[in-house]
Amino acid sequence: AGGARAHTGQTSTLDPRGEHLVCFTGGMFALGGKLFDVPEHVEIGRKLTDGCIWSYRALPLGVMPEVFHMIPCKDRTDCKWNETLWRSEASNRQGLSTDLELDAYIKKARLPKGFAQISDPRYILRPEAIESVFMMYRITGEEKYQDAAWEMFSAIIAASQTDIANAALSDITYSREQLESEGVDIRMDSMESFWMAETLKYFYLIFSEPDILSLDEWMFNTEAHPFRRNLPG
């Protein structure tokens, strides 16, 4: 996934940019596919959601960055890991010319494999990824989504908890060992209201019984407020 820029002549250019904010699209596709009986859209939703879960697991703190770039697959059906391609893309994005320069950049930026660039390494307690994980669990009943949710919750709490609340994080590319050895505190003096209104709500609901705010009877608006559906009869 990413952004696309349309040009004259019916051509377009893909910008392989990922954003935590866009992780809601997995749940959107899956829910629409389920409601309108379009299995292909449910599968698209699964792939998008699984990609966001992977983005959490790929970072040392287990938390996904705000904005990043990756390497698009040249073939949707055959996309094997290619370290040479990754290094080339990371080098090109920084305008580097030698392997020594690239190695130094990867070390300094703490760049995980697969990420060509992390342009915004913050995590601001966003809800979009767990929103889609919740939707996928309710739609499919697959327990792997509960497992992923618990991993995400545990990682976020471990990194963000303070004496009084939870804090946004300024740079999630550090490992816990690096934070301790370098004496760095990435917790910011900020906690958006959506942390409690949305993020924690979806974490709570994915471990609740399915009849609590069932998707058959309720819908959630953009800010995760539930509204009862006006069903026939």
Predicted regions and their residues:
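Glycan-recognition and catalytic cores of secretory/periplasmic carbohydrate-active enzymes
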Residues: 1-233
